[in-house]
């Protein structure tokens, strides 16, 4: 059996016991979720913790657009319950961690914003080293979520085969990133998340607002540094001596999995080193959930017909 067949077989055979199984995914895809928007006919018993009308969200974004990131964070800390930061410990996320630490120092009674880190099992060792340095520096809880039922790269490859990221990048993204993220949101009861996305990163991020609603997942996403350039982010890191990934001193600018990240050349975009030569700009966690539900429904059909 080749690696691609083995990975599909493993997914099907473990679906009955795994959190976020194929059957669960199908049910989740068909179930209704709170979008974060409220209408005049909404029942108060069914409203999510945070709800907006479209007009209210538009107004908030118009006001936040001109605010500094620290002020956006201060505002969001007050407005959103169950607020977390999801991060791969890139520069923008690290700036956010540092700013939140400063806000915490100003208001000691304020609940700290805890971090969510998706350990794909294919991160660089330098990234794992950075996680430990951030935990030591900022004394902030880091919730680490790995692919279901595996703890090491060897276990992952025994279940799904070697180089799944090459054989089926969509399946890899689901198993290593999207499902663990979904599990994190559910287990931690996340209502809103801070992200490290910025418009200057280009691609699908070129026109994102400060606050957006992920209607499929039923959460609010906040992009506090949306207006900053890479130069501004790096200047903050240098000025405030924020710990950063050692790979940035070796020509990297955006760091993901080791199998899909390379240094960038002079004048290349910040994220040019991610998925080099592929028609891809996002790892999956910011793509629509339905994109993966459709894929997994095909896997379920294959399992039934087998």
What are the residue ranges of the model-derived segments?
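Nucleotide-activated chemistry modules centered on ATP-dependent adenylation/adenylyltransferase
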Residues: 2-306
